[in-house]
Amino acid sequence: MAKKKSPGTLAENRKARHDYNIEDTIEAGIVLQGTEIKSIRRGSANLKDSYAQVKNGEMYLNNMHIAPYEEGNRFNHDPLRSRKLLLHKREIFKLGEQTREIGYSIVPLKLYLKHGHCKVLLGVARGKKKYDKRQALKEKAVKRDVARDMKARY
């Protein structure tokens, strides 16, 4: 059974935790248009296959799909446009340095509201190999079996 989202969580990238080893996380604000935030609050955002990258000293989130707002008529947004992330220069520089190493990328893990503002939890990640994924699934199954046995004892 899937975990329930916390009240502020609007979208989660569960596939990222399966495909990547997350080494570091950082919170960033995101620049949105009016119809985008309305659509996000309805739960119409998808973080799958999205990534962040540094362009000209600024951080952008690419491939995040936000469905068009139904009541948005002609003022609706482009669902897959690049969205600017709000970070300090030193944070952008640090993330840029980490991603210059081969095999590292920045993936969004969660989209949530904090004090009425939309935030993105970014993770500096290294891709897992197929055997790493299998090993992680085996460890998860063992933990589940142990927990089930402990529960049955008491």
From Swiss-Prot:
Location within or outside the cell: Cytoplasm
Keywords: Cytoplasm, RNA-binding
Cited Pfam families: SmpB
Single GO BP term: trans-translation
GO CC terms of this entry: cytosol
Entries under PROSITE patterns matching the protein: SSRP
Entry's Gene Ontology molecular function annotations: RNA binding
CDD domains to which the protein is assigned, alphabetical: SmpB
SUPFAM superfamilies in UniProt: Small protein B (SmpB)
InterPro entries hit by this protein: SmpB, SsrA-bd_prot, SsrA-bd_prot_CS
Family: Belongs to the SmpB family.
Cited function: Required for rescue of stalled ribosomes mediated by trans-translation. Binds to transfer-messenger RNA (tmRNA), required for stable association of tmRNA with ribosomes. tmRNA and SmpB together mimic tRNA shape, replacing the anticodon stem-loop with SmpB. tmRNA is encoded by the ssrA gene; the 2 termini fold to resemble tRNA(Ala) and it encodes a 'tag peptide', a short internal open reading frame. During trans-translation Ala-aminoacylated tmRNA acts like a tRNA, entering the A-site of stalled ribosomes, displacing the stalled mRNA.
Protein name: SsrA-binding protein
Organism expressing this protein natively: Staphylococcus aureus (strain JH9)
